[in-house]
C-alpha cells in the first residue's frame, strides 16, 4: 500500500486503528507450551509472557486477533512486535531471534491484510509495524546513587531499532509505528534508524509516532512537555504524532488539544480503557469509552483513533459509527520561529530581542569563574552554575 494513498485517506476521513494486543492474547489463556511450540521446546528459561514470540509459535492466535479487529472496523492494525528488539528480548535470552520474529510478524500481518481486502474489496487496510520504547532509557540513570550512569547508549538503541525495522520492512509492513514513547532520546535513535533503513531499501513508508505521558503534569517520563518534545523531533520526517497508553480517554483531551494547536502533523489517539483497577485490569466499557472519545472526533482533534491497554474489538467496533462523516484534523502550520527544546520549549522570536544563553561558566568568558577554578574554589563555582541553571529556559 503506497504512502500517497495513506496520506490521501488521512485528509479525507478519520482512520481507525486497532486495540490492545496483550489484552486479546490473555483471553486465549495460553500456557508455556503454546509459547514454546516444537521449535523452542528445550529452550532454557520461561518463555510464557514473551508475546512477540507467538508470531512464530502460534501465528494462528495472532492472525485471529488481527482479523477480529478488522471485523470491528479497523483500517490500520499493528504487528505483534512491541518488544521485538534485542534490548527487550535479552530478558528471555532471545536476542538472536529478533529479525526472525519481526519478519514473521510482518508476513503474517501482510497475509491477513491482503486476504481481508480480497474478501472485502471496499476496504483499504494498512499494516503498521509496531515498535515499542524498549525497557531501558537513555536519558536517565536507573541508579539513584550514580546519576551519570546509563543502562543503554544511543548506539545500542540505534542498532536494536535498525534490526527491528529491517525485519518489519522485509516482512511487508505499510507503516512504521513508534509507540508508547517515554524517552525522547530513545525514539530519536529509532527514528534515525528507520530513516536509514528506508533509504537503504529504497522504501518510502510513512512513519507514525505516539508518546505516553505522565498523569501528573502531562510530561513525558523523561520530563519534557509536549511542546518541548515536538521541538526535539522537528528534524525528522514523521507523518503523524499522537498519544497512547498514559491514561483513559477522559483525561487525554487537553493534551490532544495542545497537539492539535501546535503540531504540524496528523494526530493520532489511542487511549487505554480507563485506568487499571486494583487487579491491573481495565473496566471501562466500549460504550463509556466511545462517549469519552466522541469529543476528539467532534472537535476535529484527530486523524487516527484507536485503543491501547484493556481495549478489545468490542471497543473498536464503536468507532465506525462515531467517525462516520466526521471531518479529520487539519495539521497546524510549521512554527514561524526557532524552536529549541530542553525540558520545556524555548521560542526564539524577533520580539525576544537578544537571547543570552550564558557565558558565566566559561573560563575563557568569565574572569571570576576562571579565578575560582584556578583557586580550587569549586563549591563557589558550582553556585554560579546553579544560578545559571535556575535562570535558563528548561
Cite the ranges covered by each PLM segment.
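Domain-level signal for soluble alpha/beta catalytic cores
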Residues: 1-394
